[in-house]
C-alpha cells in the first residue's frame, strides 16, 4: 500500500469514527503533515478531545503529551519536576522532562486559554521556535511536531493574541446534527 493510500485509509477510518468532523479531521491531519499547530474551538461535549486523541493515536512512535490547563497549572506539570538530587549533589538546575511537553512530538493542551500567564508565556517560544526557556537553564530544544489546543471560548485578552496567532489551523466544531 502506497503512502498516499495509507493516508487515505487513516483519514477514512477517522471519518467513520467521528461523525460530522470531516473538516476537523482534514485540518488535524494537515497540522501533522505540515508541522503546524491547530486550535479547536467549540462548546463542551462536541468531541474536541476525542478528535485529537483519535488522530494522534494513529501516529506510531511519537511521544504524546496531554494536559487540561487551569489557572493553577504549574510549570512542573508541563515540563517535569526539578531534579532535586542533581541540584543538591551538583548544583545543577534542570528538569526531569521524560514524558513531558518538553520531550513530546505531539501535544494536546485542553482549555488552553484558562492557563496562567507564566504557562502561556512559555508556550510562545515552544510553539514558534520549539525552544523551552526557563530562568537559570540554557534553552532546551523541544521536538514538538504539532501542538493541538482546545477551548470552549476565544481569547478575549489582547495579551493572548501572540499565542493565538501560533495556531495556523483552526476549527470550530458544533454539536452533531444528524440523527
Placement of each model-derived feature along the sequence:
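Pre-Walker A (pre-P-loop) alpha-helix and adjacent loop at the N terminus of AAA/AAA+ ATPase modules
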Residues: 4-43
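Canonical AAA+ ATPase core
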Residues: 66, 85-90, 106-122, 127-179
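Walker A/P-loop
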Residues: 29-71
Amino acid at each position: 500500500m502506497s503512502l498516499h493510500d495509507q493516508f487515505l485509509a487513516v483519514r477514512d477510518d477517522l471519518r467513520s469514527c467521528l461523525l460530522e468532523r470531516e473538516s476537523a479531521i482534514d485540518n488535524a491531519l494537515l497540522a501533522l503533515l505540515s508541522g503546524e499547530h491547530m486550535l479547536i474551538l467549540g462548546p463542551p461535549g462536541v468531541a474536541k478531545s476525542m478528535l485529537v486523541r483519535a488522530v494522534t493515536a494513529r501516529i506510531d512512535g511519537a511521544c504524546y503529551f496531554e494536559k487540561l490547563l487551569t489557572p493553577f497549572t504549574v510549570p512542573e506539570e508541563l515540563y517535569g519536576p526539578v531534579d532535586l538530587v542533581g541540584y543538591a549533589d551538583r548544583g545543577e538546575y534542570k528538569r526531569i522532562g521524560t514524558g513531558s511537553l518538553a520531550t513530546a512530538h505531539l501535544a494536546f493542551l485542553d482549555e488552553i486559554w484558562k492557563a496562567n500567564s507564566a504557562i502561556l508565556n512559555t508556550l510562545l517560544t515552544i510553539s514558534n521556535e520549539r525552544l523551552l526557556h526557563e530562568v537559570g537553564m540554557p534553552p532546551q530544544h523541544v521536538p514538538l511536531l504539532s501542538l493541538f489546543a482546545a477551548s470552549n471560548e476565544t481569547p478575549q485578552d489582547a495579551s493572548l493574541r501572540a499565542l493565538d496567532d501560533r495556531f495556523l489551523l483552526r476549527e470550530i466544531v458544533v454539536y452533531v446534527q444528524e440523527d
